[in-house]
């Protein structure tokens, strides 16, 4: 509806509201000035969002909150966010796993899935523990004993999925670990290890690199972006997707460690 009000028999059209309405209406709001991102956590994507926010200044709003994969998809299905980051197991199985996961949520027929990058997922530990694993004085599965304190992620996070699958291979469950509690982001998890509150947690290699911690790789995973089709061509969404192929951004990813950008920006699935 056109933004207007009627005063003493005359229609008034506030310019600011009218301009905003025109932008929203034109090409599905291609110049819309808001991009809200939820879902899985990633240090490099945080850098991209921070850089975009700094360049955009007060002209647009871009925000990224790490809710975990499943909560992010729930928020997207209700229209609360414009993009959701997901990772749900091994990269070689992502072509089947990710669409199957999306199809559990209402609205998925209006979604498109874009490959951001592959990254290494594993155990984040202190450098001392990593050195012990590297020289084979400790086997990774020994970290399952009750003496080691685990930092967890919230239920529905992709990291918890990866951890559960690794534990299953060793006839273990999450409930059998000595847990210090759930962390709401990979950064919070890594921070608890860096401060000595926990000994180990499951997160990406880049998160370990950001905090100068040790890393024990478990698998390669596909980190992908879910975007509603009707907002896919908006300016902010396209800026973020183009940033994934930027040489400077990829250089930062190489410094953090564990990234593979060979398929960045490719569409891998579209709802029907």
Kindly label every feature range from the protein language model.
Residues 60-68, 174-186:
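Short beta-strand-to-loop elements that line the ligand-binding cleft
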Residues 31-41, 138-163:
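Short loop->beta-strand "edge-of-pocket" segments that line small-molecule binding or catalytic clefts
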Residues 30-31, 45-130:
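N-terminal segment of the mature folded domain
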Residues 3-25:
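Short helix-start
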Residues 116, 125-150:
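Flexible hinge/capping segments at coil-to-helix
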Residues 107-122, 209, 213-242, 263:
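Periplasmic-binding protein-like
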Residues 37-43, 89, 121, 125-133, ...:
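Short coil/turn segments
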Residues 87-102, 190-219:
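A ligand-binding cleft/hinge motif common to bilobed small-molecule-binding domains
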């Amino acid at each position: 509806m056109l933004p207007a009000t009627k005063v003493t028999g005359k229609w008034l059209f506030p310019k600011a509201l009218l301009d905003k309405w025109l932008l929203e209406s034109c090409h599905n709001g291609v110049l819309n000035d808001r991009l809200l991102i939820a879902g899985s956590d990633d240090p490099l994507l945080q850098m991209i969002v921070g850089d975009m926010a700094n360049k955009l200044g007060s002209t647009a709003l871009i925000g990224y909150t790490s809710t975990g994969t499943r909560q992010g998809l729930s928020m997207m299905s209700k229209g609360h966010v414009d993009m959701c980051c997901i990772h749900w197991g091994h990269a070689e199985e992502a072509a089947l796993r990710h669409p199957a996961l999306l199809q559990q949520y209402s609205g998925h027929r209006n979604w498109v899935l874009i490959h951001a990058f592959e990254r290494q997922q594993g155990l984040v530990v202190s450098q001392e523990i990593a050195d012990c694993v590297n020289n084979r004085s400790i086997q990774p599965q020994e970290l399952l004993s009750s003496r080691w304190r685990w930092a967890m992620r919230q239920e529905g996070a992709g990291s918890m999925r990866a951890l559960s699958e690794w534990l299953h291979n060793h006839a273990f469950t999450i409930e059998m670990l000595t847990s210090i509690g759930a962390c709401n982001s990979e950064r919070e998890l890594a921070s608890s290890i860096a401060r000595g509150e926990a000994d180990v947690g499951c997160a990406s290699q880049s998160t370990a690199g950001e905090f100068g911690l040790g890393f024990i790789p478990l698998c390669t995973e596909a980190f992908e972006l879910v975007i509603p089709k009707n907002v896919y061509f908006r300016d902010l969404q396209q800026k973020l997707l183009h940033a994934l192929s930027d040489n400077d951004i990829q250089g930062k990813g190489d410094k953090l460690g564990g990234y593979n950008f060979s398929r960045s920006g490719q569409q891998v699935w579209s709802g029907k």
